[in-house]
């Protein structure tokens, strides 16, 4: 449905490339508009990410859209990310359509005909625009991929049908910002080029005054205003969309710093929900290393096996590279090991995939550290759940996204007592923990987000651990992000673009 109102019902945030900061810009704007009293909601037609979450009504969408909904102070729904692609191989992905698993496709097969996905995305956008005053649309990748332009329903096609003005985001930190902006605009068709109303230069380092001439040059060459130059800022805790920025932190050359709790996490080829580890990464008393290639783990006190979208494939990778023996050695040395979702399955005795859910049918031997057996099934478990650590008065909350059913032979205790799923009472258990407390498995993503759980986990390593008194929660992080952007954006011009009264500074 084309928006015929003279006042835009949407604002589109597109990028000159992948990982220029579109998600963060959209999150900041959602909180800024919400703070101004605007009923705002996020939207991304198609997201390619293994970093997903569960909405309150049991649908799976990208973590970035859940964060944006939190920033906008609205309940996340499947309409905010109607098409989610979860890569499970170099050329294929599981397709989640409006919150539920739809099929598995190769990249070639997916792009042969995108009409089904485009229509679902359009319907979701219509729903959001009917329910909310303003929708902040996030684009995908570069908005000017000309070889895919006729099949791209995420960027300018969405802007056209919604009547959304477009703000173009460029990343100056990677260099070539003039070519990013001017080159992107140069290849766009005139009707789409006319929709672009401003530019945001993201991730600036140094003295902004030294870039004033650069701003003028971009405005002259592009013919549109630069709405702001946003300095690089790390002072907030907000879930990332995918593992692109994470890859630059993998396999650090140095040993863990003494005086901090050293935690290693295996960086699987198909790693998913790596935001499970973000609270550890942000804790000043913890040093977290993502490791892809095998090394001795003797300098670390804890090891985490995170989720993966291809459990048996990544288990084969783990074994073939020699990680399995390194992990067993770490176990013999008394290290603390936690497996989350796919990592939990790997720690078990066997993983069977009789239906070929994640690849070729078959069964794989696990690492054998937990007495559990997993069978992958076609129906995906999606839930938000709460409970407590067995034998402890520590409340836990998390979300489950998995296609496996794991059973224990009873030689270990259950890790969690589950008291509710999707707001319905439950009397269930999750995960296992060995008698010595050194190996833990759980399906709960986000479990370490809870300060009490994180404190409990780190005190298994260092009983004297105390959390940072200045730790910021998610809502405070959204406010900090909005304040940061507000300080560098041309707010009157931004409100002129969306044709709303500018709030008082």
From Swiss-Prot:
<dbReference type="Pfam" id="PF07685">
    <property type="entry name" value="GATase_3"/>
</dbReference>
<keyword id="KW-0169">Cobalamin biosynthesis</keyword>
<feature type="active site">
    <location>
        <position position="445"/>
    </location>
</feature>
<feature type="active site" description="Nucleophile">
    <location>
        <position position="341"/>
    </location>
</feature>
<dbReference type="InterPro" id="IPR029062">
    <property type="entry name" value="Class_I_gatase-like"/>
</dbReference>
<dbReference type="GO" id="GO:0009236">
    <property type="term" value="P:cobalamin biosynthetic process"/>
</dbReference>
<dbReference type="GO" id="GO:0003824">
    <property type="term" value="F:catalytic activity"/>
</dbReference>
<dbReference type="InterPro" id="IPR033949">
    <property type="entry name" value="CobQ_GATase1"/>
</dbReference>
<dbReference type="InterPro" id="IPR047045">
    <property type="entry name" value="CobQ_N"/>
</dbReference>
<feature type="domain" description="GATase cobBQ-type">
    <location>
        <begin position="260"/>
        <end position="453"/>
    </location>
</feature>
<comment type="similarity">
    <text>Belongs to the CobB/CobQ family. CobQ subfamily.</text>
</comment>
<dbReference type="InterPro" id="IPR027417">
    <property type="entry name" value="P-loop_NTPase"/>
</dbReference>
<comment type="pathway">
    <text>Cofactor biosynthesis; adenosylcobalamin biosynthesis.</text>
</comment>
<keyword id="KW-0315">Glutamine amidotransferase</keyword>
<dbReference type="GO" id="GO:0015420">
    <property type="term" value="F:ABC-type vitamin B12 transporter activity"/>
</dbReference>
<dbReference type="Pfam" id="PF01656">
    <property type="entry name" value="CbiA"/>
</dbReference>
<dbReference type="InterPro" id="IPR002586">
    <property type="entry name" value="CobQ/CobB/MinD/ParA_Nub-bd_dom"/>
</dbReference>
<comment type="function">
    <text>Catalyzes amidations at positions B, D, E, and G on adenosylcobyrinic A,C-diamide. NH(2) groups are provided by glutamine, and one molecule of ATP is hydrogenolyzed for each amidation.</text>
</comment>
<dbReference type="InterPro" id="IPR011698">
    <property type="entry name" value="GATase_3"/>
</dbReference>
<dbReference type="InterPro" id="IPR004459">
    <property type="entry name" value="CobQ_synth"/>
</dbReference>
<protein>
    <recommendedName>
        <fullName>Cobyric acid synthase</fullName>
    </recommendedName>
</protein>
């Amino acid at each position: 449905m084309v928006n015929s109102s003279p006042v835009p019902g949407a604002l589109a945030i597109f990028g000159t490339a992948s990982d220029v900061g579109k998600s963060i810009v959209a999150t900041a704007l959602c909180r800024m508009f919400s703070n101004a009293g605007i009923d705002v909601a996020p939207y991304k037609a198609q997201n390619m990410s293994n970093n997903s979450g569960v909405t309150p009504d049991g649908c799976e969408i990208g973590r970035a859209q859940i964060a944006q909904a939190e920033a906008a102070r609205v309940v996340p729904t499947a309409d905010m990310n109607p098409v989610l692609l979860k890569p499970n191989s170099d050329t294929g992905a599981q397709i989640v359509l409006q919150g539920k698993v739809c099929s598995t496709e190769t990249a070639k097969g997916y792009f042969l005909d995108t009409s089904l996905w485009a229509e679902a995305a359009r319907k979701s956008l219509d729903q959001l625009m009917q329910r909310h005053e303003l929708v902040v649309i996030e684009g995908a990748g570069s908005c000017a991929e000309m070889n895919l332009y006729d099949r791209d329903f995420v960027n300018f096609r969405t802007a056209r049908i919604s009547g959304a003005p477009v703000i173009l985001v460029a990343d100056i930190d990677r260099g070539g910002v003039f070519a990013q902006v001017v080159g992107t605009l140069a290849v766009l068709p005139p009707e789409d080029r006319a929709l672009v109303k401003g530019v945001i230069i993201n991730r600036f380092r140094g003295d902004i005054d030294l870039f004033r001439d650069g701003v003028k040059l971009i405005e002259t060459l592009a013919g549109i205003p630069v709405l702001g130059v946003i300095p690089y800022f790390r002072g907030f805790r907000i879930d990332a969309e995918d593992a692109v920025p994470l890859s630059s932190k993998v396999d650090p050359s140095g040993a863990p710093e003494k005086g901090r709790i050293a935690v290693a996490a295996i960086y699987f080829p198909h790693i998913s929900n790596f935001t499970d580890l973000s609270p550890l990464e942000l804790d000043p008393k913890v040093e977290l290393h993502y490791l892809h290639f095998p090394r001795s783990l003797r300098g670390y006190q804890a090891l985490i096996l995170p989720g993966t979208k291809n459990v048996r494939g990544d288990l084969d990778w783990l074994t073939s590279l020699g990680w399995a023996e390194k992990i067993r050695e770490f176990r013999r040395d008394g290290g603390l090991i936690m497996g989350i979702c796919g990592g939990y399955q790997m720690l078990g005795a066997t993983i069977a995939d009789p239906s070929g859910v994640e690849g070729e049918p078959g069964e794989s031997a696990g690492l054998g550290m937990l007495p559990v057996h997993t069978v992958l099934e076609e129906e995906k478990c999606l839930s938000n759940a709460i409970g407590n650590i067995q034998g402890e008065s520590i409340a836990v909350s998390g979300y489950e996204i998995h296609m496996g059913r794991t059973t224990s032979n009873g030689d270990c205790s259950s890790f969690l007592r589950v008291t509710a799923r999707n707001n319905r009472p439950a009397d269930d258990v999750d995960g296992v923990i060995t008698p010595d407390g050194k190996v833990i498995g759980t399906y709960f993503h986000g479990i370490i987000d809870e300060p009490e759980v994180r404190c409990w986990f780190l005190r298994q390593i260092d009983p004297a651990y105390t959390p940072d008194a200045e730790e910021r929660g998610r809502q405070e992080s959204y406010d900090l992000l909005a304040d940061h952007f507000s300080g560098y954006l041309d707010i009157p011009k931004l409100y002129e673009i969306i044709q709303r009264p500018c709030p008082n500074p």
